[in-house]
């Protein structure tokens, strides 16, 4: 019997988080724009350059796939604390630099020995990397709005390190949580990012920025989604923007089925929505998240009641789910297994 992820791939809703590649015992899965699994009954996958080994049907991947697991109806139900924060060392960071600040402080305190993150080159092409020091964290500052299989890097991390932090968008945070609960407890902290949608890097770098926005990618120093637009800032001080509604159609297909905006499965979620300019919004979701944030609190400035607060976050949650929930429920009808949007707390 093929694993459940084969159906996820078939229906083009694979999030390409990389979890299946990270945990497959024999290396039968590789993740590119979507997962690809070697199935002896489907020779077309051999032609696509999928993994070297043939799937043996252990079904480990079915236990850690965020799409197979489904979504949570109320993603704010598990928020223990919500506040604004800014790292005291946030030069070069996006907004308040909280994510980088947490990782740097935990490395310096010896609480983690590895963090999985994304860096980029001067062409904004992303690369998943294993960070092993506070100095390494400096290379990953700033948000990247293109998708890469971050969680796949855990395969190497599990072999070399014992106290691993994972930073990722909702599907990646979800996958990391499932791996921690079902496969490997070396993941000690999951930091989830707020995400409306993401783009394949070739679409962003070859289509949206040069063709639609008429900007040279190599001139860009910062990108951000805010106030209903996608903004890019260039070396010469120019600012360019395009309405998000004009480029949303170019987002990855699984993003149009995603019903998690705030990384509900993370220990700590970090974003900018709900906090003033220059600050991050911080959601403490688990006892683990509370413990680790308390360790680094002295490295942060805290705003106890940020505005516009959770009211705006809630509006964006509803905005993301408005069409996506229906799309996801429709594809769920095609699966041979049960999944969907469930009313429970994680």
Curated annotation (Swiss-Prot):
Optimum pH is 8.5. This is F(420)H(2) dehydrogenase subunit F. It is an enzyme of class 1 (oxidoreductase). Keywords: 2Fe-2S, Cytoplasm, Electron transport, FAD, Flavoprotein, Iron, Iron-sulfur, Membrane, Metal-binding, Methanogenesis, Methanol utilization, Oxidoreductase, Repeat, Transport. Signal peptide: none annotated. The gene is fpoF. Its main location: membrane. The lineage of its organism: Archaea, Methanobacteriati, Methanobacteriota, Stenosarchaea group, Methanomicrobia. Optimum temperature is 39 degrees Celsius. The FPO complex is composed of at least 13 different subunits. Residues 5-34, 46-76 form the 4Fe-4S ferredoxin-type domain. It comes from Methanosarcina mazei (strain ATCC BAA-159 / DSM 3647 / Goe1 / Go1 / JCM 11833 / OCM 88) (Methanosarcina frisia). InterPro entries: 4Fe4S_Fe-S-bd, 4Fe4S_Fe_S_CS, Co_F420_Hydgase/DH_bsu_N, FPO_su_F, FRHB/FDHB/HCAR-like, FrhB_FdhB_C. Binds 2 [4Fe-4S] cluster. GO terms for biological process: methanogenesis; methanol metabolic process. [4Fe-4S] cluster 1 binds at residues 14, 17, 20, 24.
